[in-house]
């Protein structure tokens, strides 16, 4: 690119570049979907393991001591 030489990229070259990237699009979409599903499952499992408020847990803790 030195000496004032300009390099033009043809439409065909842009199409080939886009095809290379589009090859990975389904994989990227699947990865994002799995990450979102995993995040939601993690939230759900923590809610089941540690409920926000449960008076029964407090009563059981007092009797075990």
Curated annotation (Swiss-Prot):
Name of the protein this chain belongs to: Protein MalX
Organism lineage string: Bacteria, Pseudomonadati, Pseudomonadota, Gammaproteobacteria, Enterobacterales
Protein keywords: Carbohydrate metabolism
Domain of life: Bacteria
